[in-house]
Design a protein with these regions (language model features):
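Catalytic histidine-centered segment of alpha/beta-hydrolase-like enzymes
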Residues: 322-332
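An N-terminal hydrophobic leader/cap segment in hydrolases
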Residues: 28-122
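Short beta-strand/loop motif that positions the catalytic acidic residue
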Residues: 283, 289-291, 295
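Conserved alpha/beta-hydrolase
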Residues: 152-171
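The serine-hydrolase catalytic nucleophile loop
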Residues: 138-150
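Alpha/beta-hydrolase active-site loop
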Residues: 175-196
Length: 346
């Protein structure tokens, strides 16, 4: 049986949609209110969205395998939080994923993700399976990266998909755009290794927000041997503005800038210290940067700037027709180059 879900683009996303509503309904203190929204845990703001995604991905897991992946909760902090982490063990799940994209004349469109049975034996066992940690985008959850988890597991890797703090089933009242998350992930790796759930060294696959976090985590933890970053934003402040533009541009620039500045003050950080470039300048492990030529968030110029900032081996791959929604589910185009990259470096 084919299982399918669909998504539309050209509509407000994540905290941008919340900022839009704030702009339309509030008359004062917008910088402060916007800052609080920017750093607040998405799973505390978007209950309905997470419930809908949870239903979709739970259904996917049930169709792909009768042996449900094991999830554990790992305490991290400060600030105090617990991360929900799902293990997908290497074996043949007899599954393939097909993405169908439909474009509208107004520049919008839709995509449908199909999960289909694969009767062929596609499992590629390895001697001792290397571990790949998978990180989702802003406002998503670990189950949203399950297709990549199953594809990598079929390629012989052990996969750990993580709900970042404030996402999915993880806890934490605030997100830190890397300041909290890089420490969280290092602590989680310590505890996962102690439980026998991962190797000393790992590879990372990140999407969007998770891709930039992966670059900054790798820069701070020598146990990361390689990174595949799909559609990483470069400068956080610029990414916030671009998300607003993609949502319709209804939030004035001054509010976005003021909110971002106030958020940085609340987090006691400099946005530039947590950019994609900042991470790449510090890390030496091999990095595969993947973007879409039509992505307004991670633009081709950003991929070029990230490559120039890299201190070690770096390769880029840009899909000519992909936008920010499509690039992360371009399984036909990306499965082989991503699995080959990890095989050669783990």
């Amino acid at each position: 049986m084919v299982q399918k879900t669909s998504a539309w683009w050209h509509r407000p996303l994540g905290f941008v949609g919340l900022l839009v509503s704030l702009w339309l309904t509030s008359g004062c203190g917008l910088n402060r209110v916007a800052a609080n929204r920017i750093i607040a845990a998405p799973n505390l703001q978007q209950h309905r969205m997470f419930a809908a995604w949870d239903s979709v991905w739970t259904n996917l897991l049930a169709k792909v395998t009768t042996n449900q992946p094991v999830s554990v909760m790992i305490p991290v902090g400060p600030p105090e939080a617990s991360l929900s982490i799902m293990e997908i063990v290497p074996r043949d799940y007899h599954t393939k994923f097909v993405t169908t994209v439909t474009h509208r004349p107004d520049g919008g469109g839709s995509l449908a993700l199909n999960w289909e049975p694969e009767p062929r034996n596609t499992f590629q066992p390895r001697g001792r399976p290397a571990t790949i940690v998978v990180l989702h985008g802003y406002g998503m959850m670990k189950e949203a990266m399950a297709p990549w988890g199953f594809l990598l597991a079929q390629a012989g890797f052990r996969v750990l998909s993580i709900d970042l703090r404030g996402h999915g089933r993880s806890t934490g009242a605030r997100i830190g755009f890397g300041k909290y998350e890089t420490a969280d992930l290092s602590q989680a790796l310590d505890q996962l290794k102690a439980r026998g759930l991962c190797d000393e060294q790992v590879g990372l696959l990140g999407l969007s927000y998770g891709a930039t976090l992966a670059l900054n985590w790798a820069a701070r933890d020598p146990r990361v041997r390689t990174v595949v970053a799909i559609a990483p934003y470069n400068q956080p402040e610029e990414a916030i503005r671009r998300f607003a533009d993609m949502a319709g541009g209804r939030v004035p620039t001054r509010i976005l800038r003021g909110g971002a500045a106030a958020a940085a003050a609340k987090l006691e950080l400099n946005w530039k210290d947590w950019s994609g470039e900042a991470g790449l300048r510090q890390l030496q492990c091999p990095v595969l940067l993947i973007g879409g030529a039509k992505d307004p968030i991670c633009q081709p110029a950003d991929i070029e700037a990230l490559q120039k900032a890299a201190g070690g081996e770096t390769k880029t791959l840009v899909l000519p027709e992909a936008n920010h929604y499509v690039v992360g589910v371009s399984f036909k185009e990306l499965t082989e180059p991503i699995t080959d990259w990890f095989r050669e470096r783990l």
